[in-house]
Amino acid sequence: MGRSLKKGPFIADSLLRKVEKQNDTDDKSVIKTWSRASTILPMMIGHTIAVHNGKSHVPVFITEQMVGHKLGEFAPTRTFKGHIKDKKGGR
């Protein structure tokens, strides 16, 4: 179920301030954040945001198709190493 329209999208205040500051100064340095729940807004297009995945920060370049999604969707937290092969012979 989606978020109520009267509330608007969630974005962390610190992240919003950093993006607005970079838009004012035309700076495109990487923004580091732990806020995976923040919604991607149109003002973020063209920025690179390093999203924390629990171990390290994964750089995510924001494009138009990402608007409306959450930052955490683009920084996977689990690594799949493959299924275990069956033992030959078994029982």
Curated annotation (Swiss-Prot):
A GO molecular function for this record? structural constituent of ribosome
List where the protein spans the membrane: none
One Pfam family of this chain: Ribosomal_S19
Gene3D superfamilies, alphabetized: 30s Ribosomal Protein S19, Chain A
Q: Name one GO cellular component term.
A: cytoplasm
Query: Which terms does the UniProt entry file under GO BP?
Result: ribosomal small subunit assembly; translation
Alphabetized InterPro entries for the sequence = Ribosomal_uS19, Ribosomal_uS19_bac-type, Ribosomal_uS19_CS, Ribosomal_uS19_SF
Superkingdom of origin: Bacteria
What keywords does the record list, in alphabetical order? Ribonucleoprotein, Ribosomal protein, RNA-binding, rRNA-binding
Signal sequence region: none
UniProt record similarity statement: Belongs to the universal ribosomal protein uS19 family.
Q: Give the protein's function.
A: Protein S19 forms a complex with S13 that binds strongly to the 16S ribosomal RNA.
What protein is this chain from?
Small ribosomal subunit protein uS19
Where does this protein come from, organism-wise? Parasynechococcus marenigrum (strain WH8102)
Q: What is the lineage of its organism?
A: Bacteria, Bacillati, Cyanobacteriota, Cyanophyceae, Synechococcales
